[in-house]
Amino acid sequence: MTDDHPRADIVSRQYHRWLYPHPIADLEAWTTANWEWFDPVHSHRILWPDREYRPDLDILIAGCGTNQAAIFAFTNRAAKVVAIDISRPALDHQQYLKDKHGLANLELHLLPIEELATLGRDFDLVVSTGVLHHLADPRAGMKELAHCLRRDGVVAAMLYGKYGRIGVELLGSVFRDLGLGQDDASIKLAKEAISLLPTYHPLRNYLTKARDLLSDSALVDTFLHGRQRSYTVEECVDLVTSAGLVFQGWFHKAPYYPHDFFVPNSEFYAAVNTLPEVKAWSVMERLETLNATHLFMACRRDRPKEQYTIDFSTVAALDYVPLMRTRCGVSGTDMFWPGWRMAPSPAQLAFLQQVDGRRTIREIAGCVARTGEPSGGSLADLEEFGRKLFQSLWRLDFVAVALPASG
């Protein structure tokens, strides 16, 4: 086997020695406070806005690492989860979790993405986070994922973000110039270099969000990786379309949209909103430069667009059903997201208090009208206010949307 073969190349050798992410010892304990972003038990309406959660999904985790596939199998017991990876130590830990938690629905394979077709399987959900940007040919990898996707299925992917990782790329270039490798001496030098950075270095902002860099494996994966690249918005979309897929949307939308929820009368944001969608996303990623990862969904071209298209620009959006996203909600007069909270206006709060996962925006506006709070305005005015409010909250990742049943 040659050194450039996916089973034996520099990336495979790295993950054989440096196990990453950090292995989870107990899934029951971990899932009390944590969750996987693309896990359908939490996020099915983001993946499939047109349908309820389906427990018997066929799920592929392409590049499962140490924990991810076992987490999906643990939280989706009726699903069939197939996992592939190039790291035997990572798969060994997945096997440990499978045995510990009785995950009969988890199937493990030592297999690179480039050889995915040898499984001869197709899937409802294909998850690949943190893998494609390490491949020798990411386009070929994305095509492999596309080829095993069912018509109504979803590819859920993560790629490194170019602007949020500028500090990482600067340090990586320094370490390459110094000839650092993945040995203990190189790791020691890298740690010292990071400790010497001035407060204004671009990496400092990244370090405030990267909580796992205390481990040597995480440091190697971030700064001393054998092969990696970062992507802009437009490059993410291009990678999707190069595989014959359609870009379905962002999983985390907040970094890609202007937010009139906070600045309601901004002329600049109004100008951004007039741009074509991909161009607007590109503009915003160059302003919101802390976004180090792109999480997005893609699907087949023959999947009906009405199954996944969210469009608040017409009155048809009044038939959307808003649902709180994971760990989002209302407490007293506050609204909260993971990690922060704020006080909405009384008018906004009146709408938020009516969200129950069943009422449409139209019905919520009717409830607000009947309560008389906030006072003033016709029902049509309240419906317009609600439509714009829930568009803002959807862009802020506070709510997901359930589309009305077709037919």
Curated annotation (Swiss-Prot):
GO MF term (any one): methyltransferase activity
A Pfam family the protein falls into: Methyltransf_12
GO CC annotations, alphabetized: peptidoglycan-based cell wall; plasma membrane
InterPro entries, per database record: Methyltransf_12, SAM-dependent_MTases_sf
Name of the protein: Uncharacterized protein Rv2067c
